[in-house]
């Protein structure tokens, strides 16, 4: 599902991407709270729930096409997302931690960013803000280190500003909604995106 609030040309565009397969879970709750903070601060927001889309994994067959067009030629639900990524000023990626990395839904989405590898397209991401929101079940706070490292390196490669991250231990579905401190932190991250 893709949902948005329309805004004027001067507004910051914030794209929220939910990579959890679970509806109404901790990832979705936190990304929505970041987006609420961004909207209340005057940003236009758009929200994508990846599990509702049909996005195929990279097939490594269209490398030249990707490098010359800045998007992939696989005909699936990723196609309209390229323009949304290009048009955003900030991207909020939400994913639970699965095996020390992102969910399959988010990984496939990010793998299709190969289309941005050519400098002509990568430069369009220079200065865009990237935020990671990641709830995880493990009580070991080092659990998301590899996920953070992956996204930090990706942001560096594309000259994006890895501006914030929210890493939260949350064992049961929806638990974060009762954690006022975490919800405030998520809201504040969204509100700060305009700065």
Predicted regions and their residues:
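Short, well-ordered helical secondary-structure segments
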Residues: 59, 112, 120, 145, ...
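Sparse recognition of residues in long alpha-helices and their boundaries
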Residues: 43, 122-125, 171
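N-terminal beta1-alpha1-beta2 submodule of the flavodoxin-like/Rossmannoid cofactor-binding fold
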Residues: 1-116, 173-176, 180-195
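A short, flexible beta-alpha/helix-coil linker loop
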Residues: 136-139, 169-173
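Short, glycine-/small-residue-rich phosphate/pyrophosphate-handling segment
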Residues: 104-105, 119-164
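Intrinsically disordered, low-complexity segments used for protein-protein interactions
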Residues: 64, 127, 168-171
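Short beta-strand elements in bilobed, periplasmic/extracellular small-molecule ligand-binding domains
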Residues: 44-49, 160-168
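Short beta-strands and strand-loop turn motifs
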Residues: 17-18, 94, 132-135, 166-167
């Amino acid at each position: 599902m893709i949902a948005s609030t329309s805004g004027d040309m001067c507004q910051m565009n914030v794209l929220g991407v939910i990579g959890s397969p679970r509806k109404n879970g901790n990832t979705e709750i936190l990304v929505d709270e970041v987006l609420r903070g961004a909207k209340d601060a005057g940003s236009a927001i758009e929200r994508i729930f990846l599990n509702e889309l049909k996005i195929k994994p990279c097939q490594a067959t269209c490398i030249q096409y990707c490098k010359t067009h800045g998007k992939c030629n696989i005909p699936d639900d990723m196609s309209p997302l390229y323009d949304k990524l290009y048009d955003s000023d900030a991207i909020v990626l939400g994913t639970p931690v699965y095996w020390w990395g992102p969910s399959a839904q988010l990984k496939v989405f990010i793998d299709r960013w190969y289309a941005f590898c050519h400098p002509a397209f990568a430069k369009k991401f220079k200065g865009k803000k990237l935020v990671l929101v990641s709830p995880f079940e493990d009580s070991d706070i080092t659990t998301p280190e590899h996920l953070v490292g992956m996204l930090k390196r990706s942001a560096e490669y594309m000259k994006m500003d890895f501006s914030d991250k929210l890493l939260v231990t949350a064992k049961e579905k929806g638990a974060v909604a009762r954690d006022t401190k975490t919800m405030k932190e998520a809201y504040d991250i969204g509100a700060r995106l305009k700065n």
